[in-house]
Amino acid sequence: MTLVIVFAVVLFGLLAYLGWINKSASTSVAAPVTLPSTPYPVGTPSARAPSRLAPPSASAIPGYQLTYVADFASSGIPKGWDLFKGEPGGDPGAQLSPNHVGVYDGKLVLATYRDKAYGNRWVAGGLCQCGLPNLYGAYFVRSRVTGPGPNEVQLLWPANNQWPPEIDFNESSSISHTTATVHWGVGNYILQTHLKGVDLTKWNTWGVVWTPKKIVYVLNGRAWGAITTPGAVPHMKMTLNLEQRTECTIHRQCPRRPVQMLVAWIAEFHRR
């Protein structure tokens, strides 16, 4: 896997993402950060698990305790999660529907397909762990996509909905390229890290370790990016969000056939 790390600081207008619009003003480059060498959890081998790896053990991260696990063994959406509906901000023409999210065969499924209820438009799914906000922690999501088209998004969003900050720890632009981005400040400063050469159609364990002084991005147990810039690290409660998005109106990230984002499990840790 080829690893390409690019840090860029971009000054945007205040409006962005869920109900806001980005307006680029300037760009500068930040110095690379030394990555932790300590391995992070990938999962526990299990022949019965849909992805062949079950959630990590309670002691998988020294100094942390396992505080939340969802393995989607039951048929319903876990308690504490809310489903998105409507047009996502910053993505005109796209559409999210609660009917495009469900739990099947031990997996959380976000499904993008042409929906007759929306005039046969491409409609995707998304949800947030809005009922379980936390301050700092380590979040791990084992997921894959079934094909190209809509992107895969895993992020932390402010619990009070006062944006920024925002931590996107897996926001793909293709099935082989993803980015991690932190937004902060009233001008929406951005630090972005790119990862190329990864196969998003295979099962991967994505993670973010968020502490008072650092944000570390993790893929399959290995740190691949880190942020230590003063002011960039959020200090407010945030919630985990999972989404698929299309940009068919501008001829990007638009599927040619139905595509799914599959999630085998979610595990969250917090310091003891």
Where are these regions (language model features)?
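GH16 jelly-roll
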Residues: 2-5, 9, 22, 35, ...
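C-terminal region of N-terminal signal peptides and the immediate post-cleavage residues
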Residues: 12-38
